[in-house]
């Protein structure tokens, strides 16, 4: 996946189209079914994706204007908005998903080139504006899987899987609760190391499948562990 936000917009558009296609098939009973996220229904996931699009509009507007605009008014309001949006009828969910995605796309289109160099404030700290489009792609692709419909990590592109794997491995390497791991993907010449290599089992497999396992979106049944044994348990990641 490219790091150029403008080139990534096409990937976001395609991912959004796939997401909306899935969401359009849900009736009220489907939306009330559990998602892959503990405590969240499919309705919660869709409401979150809509509010995430609007939060990114705030971040993009902040980068473009120089005004300090928080992505969310507060953690409490973010949680409340998702809870309030979860039980809505299917047609309202779908309309919100489409309209919020359109607002996000318009905010990206309004960005002048210099604005991508700005730094914006997110819930997890400062972030270059140039990474906001990737963040939206990541949200849509991962949470599409969380809908527990027919979209799986195997449907992610290899480029997306590679970038996600590198990002997650980098994040986990900075955490104290992550197990030591050597991640060997797409052949023995490509690997990432988390923690003390000398104490780490080697987990091997396609990059997409390792990324899905590390993010908790797959049990990793197709991965191999050397020396033989069970896969370690990575900590929760988004």
Predicted ranges, named:
Residues 15-18, 22, 52, 100-103, ...:
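Amphipathic, well-ordered alpha-helical segments in soluble domains
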Residues 2-11, 30-52, 80-93, 120-138, ...:
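Alpha-helical scaffold segments that form or flank carboxylate-/histidine-based iron centers
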């Amino acid at each position: 996946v490219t790091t150029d936000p403008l080139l990534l917009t096409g990937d976001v558009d395609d991912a959004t189209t796939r997401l909306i296609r899935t969401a359009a098939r849900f009736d009220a009973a489907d939306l009330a079914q559990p998602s892959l996220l503990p405590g969240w229904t499919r309705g919660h996931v869709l409401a979150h994706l809509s509010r995430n699009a609007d939060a990114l509009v705030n971040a993009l507007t902040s980068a473009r204007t120089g005004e300090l605009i928080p992505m969310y008014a507060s953690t409490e309001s973010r949680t409340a908005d998702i809870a309030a949006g979860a039980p809505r009828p299917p047609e309202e969910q779908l309309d919100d998903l489409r309209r919020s995605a359109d607002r996000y796309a318009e905010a990206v289109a309004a960005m002048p080139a210099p604005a991508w160099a700005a730094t914006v404030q997110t819930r997890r700290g400062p972030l270059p504006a140039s990474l906001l489009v990737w963040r939206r792609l990541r949200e849509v692709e991962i949470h599409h899987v969380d809908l527990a419909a027919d979209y799986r990590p195997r449907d992610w592109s290899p480029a997306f899987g590679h970038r996600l794997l590198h990002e997650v491995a980098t994040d986990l390497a900075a955490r104290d609760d992550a197990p030591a791991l050597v991640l060997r993907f797409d052949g023995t010449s490509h690997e990432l190391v988390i923690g003390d290599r000398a104490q780490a089992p080697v987990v091997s497999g396609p990059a997409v499948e390792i990324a899905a396992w590390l993010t908790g979106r797959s049990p990793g049944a197709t991965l191999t562990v050397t020396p033989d044994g069970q896969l370690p348990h990575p900590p929760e990641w988004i």
